Amino acid sequence: MLCAIYKSKKKLGSYLYVANREDFSSVPSVLLEHFGKPELVMMFNLLGRKALYNVDCNEVLETIKRQGFYLQIAKQDDGLFNSLSEIK
């Protein structure tokens, strides 16, 4: 499965993974507001042999299947995205 990976210009080290390029329909609008305009980093095959940095491909794949997107945040994040369930 290919996914599109976007980085945040507002939140250093934050990445948003979606199943289809430019399709943010499953991402809550409040999350997108905090994330800022997504900047495409790359298309990535989650079922391929290459690994992602600091995140498990299977976890990303399952989360995209379940909720339509995956949010990767920097470990030193200030807590803005930590309660994603409240944003939905």
From Swiss-Prot:
InterPro entries: YcgL-like_sf, YcgL_dom
SUPFAM superfamilies found in the cross-reference section: YcgL-like
A Pfam cross-reference name: YcgL
Source superkingdom: Bacteria
Residues covered by the YcgL domain: 1-85
Protein name per its UniProtKB record: YcgL domain-containing protein CGSHiGG_01115
Lineage: Bacteria, Pseudomonadati, Pseudomonadota, Gammaproteobacteria, Pasteurellales
